[in-house]
């Protein structure tokens, strides 16, 4: 196994070129790269080729819970309980797309995205201010929730689900391969426990190794 923090765009283009010479032609910045927060874990297969088994990122967006608990008001006039959600999380789409390009020849996609913060609620919560006032955060508020901006990365499939195995969809005379990120959110906006994150990442990495089974056969059966 090996761990890497980043992947060069040049390597991604080379992987695309191996599939079809028309792909991976464009590169303007020679040293361009991507750097997912959690990096990449790879295994060397029986043919000495490095194969990705896990890519992970953790993103926090929305500090409304923390601000309310501290009694901090927000907004230009400092008179609001809630701050309108931003778009910073959408940067994750770039890394997901690039790893999908790198793994286009594979039949699995072990990209895990962990989300926390008030912009990723899946349930309505109530938070108490220091003065005792209760503030309600609605999970389906267009002002707060940004989950719908990320589910494009998993084709609107379920969140909090291991989607590592690619889905092959038949439509009319075509078969379409879907590479979907596995998106996990706490739901209540709170921070992730490291053990829960580890268990999820372990499950996804295990799925990757299962998908690579025939290419790891000699190592698995080595006495």
What label would you give each PLM region?
Residues 1, 50-53, 107-110:
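Residue-level recognition of the N-termini of beta-strands and the immediately preceding loop/turn
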Residues 55-63, 113-117:
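Short loop/turn segments at strand-loop or loop-helix junctions that form parts
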Residues 1-49, 195, 199-202, 206-223:
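Basic, amphipathic N-terminal segments that precede the first structured/catalytic domain
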Residues 49-52, 65-69:
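Short, conserved acidic/polar surface loops in the N-terminal third of protein domains
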Residues 130-223:
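Charged, low-complexity C-terminal accessory regions
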Residues 38-40, 52-60, 92:
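Conserved catalytic cores of phosphodiester-cleaving nucleases, focusing on short active-site segments
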Residues 26-32, 50-53, 76-89:
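Glycine-rich, flexible loop segments associated with nucleotide phosphate handling
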Residues 67-168:
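Acidic, metal/cofactor-coordinating or nucleic-acid-engaging core segments within structured domains
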């Amino acid at each position: 196994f090996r761990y890497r923090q980043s992947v060069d765009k040049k390597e991604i283009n080379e992987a695309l070129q191996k599939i079809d010479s028309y792909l991976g032609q464009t590169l303007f910045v020679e040293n361009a790269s991507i750097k997912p927060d959690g990096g990449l874990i790879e295994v060397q297969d029986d043919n000495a080729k490095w194969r990705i088994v896990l890519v992970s990122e953790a993103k926090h967006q929305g500090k409304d819970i923390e601000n309310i608990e501290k009694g901090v008001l927000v907004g230009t006039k400092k008179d609001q309980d809630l701050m309108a959600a931003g778009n910073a999380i959408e940067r994750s789409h770039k890394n997901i797309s690039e790893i999908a390009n790198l793994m286009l020849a594979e039949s699995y996609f072990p990209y895990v995205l962990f989300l926390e913060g008030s912009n990723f609620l899946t349930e309505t919560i109530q938070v108490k201010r220091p003065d005792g006032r209760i503030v309600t955060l609605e999970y389906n508020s267009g002002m707060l929730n940004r989950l719908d901006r990320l589910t494009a990365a998993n084709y609107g499939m379920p969140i909090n689900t291991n989607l590592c195995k690619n889905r092959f969809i038949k439509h009319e005379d075509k078969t379409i391969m879907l590479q979907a990120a596995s998106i996990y959110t706490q739901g209540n906006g709170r921070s992730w426990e490291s053990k829960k994150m580890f268990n999820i990442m372990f499950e996804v990495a295990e799925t990757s190794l299962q998908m690579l089974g025939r290419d790891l056969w000699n190592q698995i059966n080595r006495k």
